[in-house]
Amino acid sequence: MTIGLLLALSFLVSLLGLAFLIWAVSNRQMELHQGQAYTVFVPGEAGQADDATMAGADAQAAGPHHYDAVRAGIDAVSRRPVLILLASGVVWLALGSVFGVMASLKLHWPDWLSAYEPLTFGRVRTLHLNLVTYGWLSLTGIGVALWVAPRIFHTALRHPRLPILGAALWNIALAAGAAAIASGWTDGEEWLEIPWQIDILLAAAGACFVLPLLRTALNRNVGHIYVTGWYYLGALCWFPVLFFIANLPGLHSGVQEATVNWWFAHNVLGLWLTPLGVGAAYYFIPKIIGKPIYSYSLSLLGFWGLALFYSQVGIHHLIGGPVPTWVVTLSIVHSVMMFVPVIAVAVNQHVTVARNLWVLKTSVPLRFISLGALMYTAASFQGSIEALRSVNTVTHFTQYTVGHAHLGAYGFVSFVLFGAVYHTLPRLTGRAWPWPRMIAVHFWLVVAGFAVYFVSLTAGGLLQGLAMLDATRPFADSVTVLKPYLEARSAGGILMTLGHLIFAAHFLAVVARGRAPSSAAEASARDTIPATAA
């Protein structure tokens, strides 16, 4: 019964994507030509590289882009809610990173801080997962979306006070959820550990983000919805459905509960964080380079492929478990089908960057975003291959899976968001980053740290899996063979955390200086803010 309900709900999510497609076709959103890719620019802006952190720029040139004065009326409405969301995300990143390092160290120093219940492995690891997922990735992703969406819709954000209320509710809920997890009160499901009673606040907060974005889209001043808008609208429509169904108390139990759990857990990555990351990349890559994406037709193929194929991917995590074989097989098929939208995104974004490699030499935000886009391709290909039974036999229950999860959530989404914040904050505050060299230091710390982290978990996980498959070897061998790789993981995690702390301090230094005085052009543009936006 529950398996059937789950599949029905999965198809419902896919049908929601199909409904979007039908609406898009009927409203001529699918009449594609490359000219639609210029939606991200205002007249005269195309061909102008746009990055306030470019190497060699003096203090004056490092300020907001010339064409931002044209958008000042739009940006002024979004400024406060976006700044609150970004600041909240950065705080949760710093805190979540500390818990992540603690959890990593406990894997090879198991007795460290074990006398304190809130600091035992099970709790600090869960705190790390929830704080970076629902704190850093979600709040920052929403903040970037609420800043980008009005720009691509060419109209001011509607109901801008609602996201401020949503940010307050979300932060309160996340703080309460963290306290509950630390005390041992959880729902006991991966990615769903925060008690459902607290999740009600998160749901209310989510509504405060969805309504303004939908209203802004409905009141847009352009006929065509740029591909970034589709990803953002999809994310903010899919996630509430997933979150509500997975958190209904008492509806599922036993094997069915595990099935629903992984249906939700994987869709959080694919139908929530992925659209936030890919959508941001589709805006910032052409915006920083000053040229449109390589193929606009391919960009929409990538979105609709994600909408139609992804919702049933997660059950491959239960290969070998007591679930119907056909359900797992269906999930594997959908996992392999994901090659189609991923290749579309990969060709589009990588070719756009490859044709303009000179910008990478001067723009660190573009390095973050383009490297994040590369890691999206790698994580997606790896996930599709890992879903195959022959591969999963080796990698299941190993640290290989942990490395894969971080390749997507950190290597892809976090890197894109780092670049997005570096590009956005000077436009929110009117002030340049005070220590441009620290941006490069942050980049190399997290790149080096993540390289050590991912390579060690991938290699160690494969050795761990092979050791567990060898019936002639005791289980303890799979533990001892892994230890040096876990130590390397901790070293990589410490480097990443140092980068995060530099990022947080740099962010605070900009925000603490306050908003810079507006130019005459910006003041004039703000006078054109529509009354309906307030």
Spans of model-derived segments:
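Feature marks short, highly hydrophobic, charge-poor N-terminal signal-anchor/signal peptide-like helices
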Residues: 1-10
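Membrane-proximal first intracellular loop
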Residues: 71-79, 116-118, 122-126, 156-157, ...
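Non-cytosolic membrane-interface motifs at loop->transmembrane helix junctions
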Residues: 188-199, 224-228, 256-266, 323-334, ...
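Hydrophobic cores of alpha-helical transmembrane segments in multi-pass integral membrane proteins
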Residues: 9-21, 83-108, 121-155, 159-183, ...
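Membrane-interface helix-loop junction between the first two transmembrane segments
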Residues: 23-32, 102-116
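Amphipathic, hydrophobic secondary-structure cores in small proteins
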Residues: 7, 16-38
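Extramembrane terminal tails and long inter-domain/linker segments of multi-pass membrane proteins
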Residues: 29-83, 113-116, 464-483, 510-534
